[in-house]
Amino acid sequence: MSKSSIGTEPVYDARTLGKPRMFILGLQHMFAMFGATVLVPALSGLDVATTLLFAGIGTLLFHLLTKGKVPAFLGSSFAFIGGYNAVRTIGTNADGSAIYNNDLLAYACFGVAIAGLMYIILSTLFKIFGVKKVMRYFPPIVTGPIIIAIGLTLSSSAITNCRANWLIAIVAILIVIGFNMWGKGMAKIIPILLGVLGSYIFAIIIDPAERASVAAAVSSAKWFGLPIVWKNSVFHLFAGPVDSGMLWSAVLTIVPLSLATMVEHIGDICAISSTCGKNFMVDPGFHRTLLGDGLATTLASLFGAPANTTYGENTGVLALSRVYDPRVIRIAACIAIVVSFCPKFAALVSAMPTATIGGVSLVLYGMISAVGVRNVVENKVDFTNTRNVIIAALILVLAIGITYSGSIQIGVVSLSGLAVASIVGILLNAILPGKDYTFEQNDQGATSVDFKV
């Protein structure tokens, strides 16, 4: 590939860029997912190194089961944090804060492992009935607003991170925009990596406290460490006496959460399909993507790592770089595995300024929403049709409103705004009269994704 065409044309085979460039692109994806992935264990009491190890292994397993066709990275899922905390809570302090017993995390991990198996059940249904019968319920008027909502619902975390230091965040944003718009050659397709490095260095230069924090974190970390905490694993749980009541409680608390994450998985695969211009819903198919996500979650949980999920951050990187080769994602997965054995490098990345993460995330989440807009426009959705307006309006308002006001609790099931919006959108599309979309005969734009099956 000529240097002048890099960043201006889609790249489906990154081998044309050369191995050094592929490694740098993989590093960019690793940095994009790192902030959110290490936050999950921090909030749930699990281990960061174990999380990174099984984010990498889970991603490679997903790619194996999806024939290496889907450029998705599997990071740690936020959807199960409430489940982990519910299982390990043993009381409350005088101020109302929870008292946690991390020895109970192995029970929670068992519950998540069973939740991962629920994906296999849905995967089997897709295989038996075929994607054609299922995907009629996911026309562009449903998938487009859902993809838009994915980016918008993630945006609050980006803004929160930016507030830590708006100057550093703005520097990150300007670097990303500058290189993506006016960069030449390789610089044009690694704007996120350059934004992270540039704003990181800027923060260290202008902020003595940040400089001291990074130095302390890196100097105290070891060069090598084993990334598995045995006491959090399900194997350790069954190596001794097991509280069957606690085991059932963990399963009943956590497994229902998989209903929401499976709906979100479908939205994520639609987003990746729209970004790359390929119909991954048909080839390799939802039955394979669900199987890969579910087994990755079960495997991670057995060893005491958080549940895995397809990551929106990396979808944003795909949209920005226009390099869609899954090989690059697999390189990122291998880097994550290596980093999990090196606490010093993990500490260096973990010490990344919060505002830096916020700045690059703001761009990435915006790119996801822009992909949703493109999906609607290129599939020529008619917004003079009241039916379409109602469906899109409710998906967007429910997703954003519930996200900012708190999830809906139905018994032990906690439904996120995106899950509720997806369910409502699917139901309205199935129930409301006046469909103007025929699944097998979609009138698409010249550059739209062919969603026909």
Where do the protein language model's features map onto the residues?
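Intrinsically disordered, low-complexity non-transmembrane regions of multi-pass membrane transporters
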Residues: 1-24, 211-239, 274-278, 431-453
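N-terminal signal-anchor module of multipass membrane proteins
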Residues: 1-74, 78-102
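Membrane-embedded helical hairpins/re-entrant loop segments and their flanking transmembrane helices
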Residues: 11-20, 40-63, 67, 253-326, ...
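Membrane-embedded hairpin module used as a gating/binding unit in multi-pass transport
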Residues: 33, 199-301, 305
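Juxtamembrane helix-boundary/capping and inter-helix hinge elements in multi-pass membrane proteins
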Residues: 43-46, 87-103, 139-140, 274-284, ...
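Short, non-helical or kinked segments that cap or interrupt transmembrane helices
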Residues: 46-51, 68-81, 134-143, 188-194, ...
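Interfacial segments of multi-pass membrane proteins
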Residues: 84-91, 180, 314-329, 335-340
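Membrane-embedded alpha-helical modules
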Residues: 104-210, 333-442
